[in-house]
Each structure stands twice: as structure tokens, then as C-alpha cells.
Amino acid sequence: MPTIQQLIRFERKQIVGTSKSAALESCPQKKGVCTKVYTTTPKKPNSALRKVARVRLTSGFEITAYIPGIGHNLQEHSVVLIRGGRVKDLPGVRYHIIRGALDSTGVKNRLRARSKYGASKPKK
């Protein structure tokens, strides 16, 4: 515990918090180009092949982003839109690719939560 005199000489430093999605630079989304599209395995106790992409953003950052939904058309040099949001069982994956924007197509035959996966309304 500092004395009053010490507080007069050295004022308290504010604790600066770090961003959970630094590469977005306070923007809601960022555009980027896929440099590598691959699958990876989640940490214990889960088991799957999660689809992820390495993306170079327009801001110069190189990030790993998750590709949500069933099936995708992404490959190297695809232009994608990135939003924040981590994947809890994939360490280091702190961003999501927005489906249905730019080169990423929406999920086929998706009936519920369509807006989250860029799926169009089905024909009656």
C-alpha cells in the first residue's frame, strides 16, 4: 500500500485492457484473402475436423478464421469478409468468416438461422 507522499510523486497507472479481436482494429468487419484453407482438430474432449482458413487482411494482419456451416467453396485466393468471434475448442481461432458475402457462398438447404449462414429463402 503506497503512502500519500508516494501517490503524489507517482500517480497510479491505468490498466490498459487488450482487445479480443485486435486484427479488426475496432471495425465490425474486415476484408481479406485466403492464403490457406485446411481442417484442424479441436482440443479435448471434442473430436472433429473443423474447417479453418488462414487469411491475410487488408490491414496487413495474418489471422486464422473459422468457416461455419456445412460445406464451403473457399480456396486459396478467395476474398472473404471476417467478423469477430472465437471458436472455443480451437486455440488461436478468434475470427469467423461471414457466409454469403464476397467469394463465400451461403450454406445450401439451410432452413433455420438462415441469416447467419447467408442462405436464401427456399422456394415454395
From Swiss-Prot:
The record's family statement is:
Belongs to the universal ribosomal protein uS12 family.
Keyword Ribonucleoprotein (UniProt): yes
**Identification of the protein by name:** Small ribosomal subunit protein uS12c
Could you tell me the Gene Ontology terms of the biological process aspect for this record? translation
Q: What does this protein do?
A: With S4 and S5 plays an important role in translational accuracy. Located at the interface of the 30S and 50S subunits.
- InterPro entries in UniProt: NA-bd_OB-fold, Ribosomal_uS12, Ribosomal_uS12_bac
Top-rank taxon: Eukaryota
SUBUNIT field: Part of the 30S ribosomal subunit.
Q: Give the molecular function GO annotations.
A: rRNA binding; structural constituent of ribosome
Localization of this protein:
Plastid, Chloroplast
GO CC terms: chloroplast; small ribosomal subunit
**Major localization listed first in the record, in broad terms:** plastid
**Lyase as a keyword?**
no
**PROSITE patterns from the entry?**
RIBOSOMAL_S12
Keyword annotations for this protein? Chloroplast, Plastid, Ribonucleoprotein, Ribosomal protein, RNA-binding, rRNA-binding
A Pfam family of this chain: Ribosom_S12_S23
Name the SUPFAM superfamilies for this protein.
Answer: Nucleic acid-binding proteins
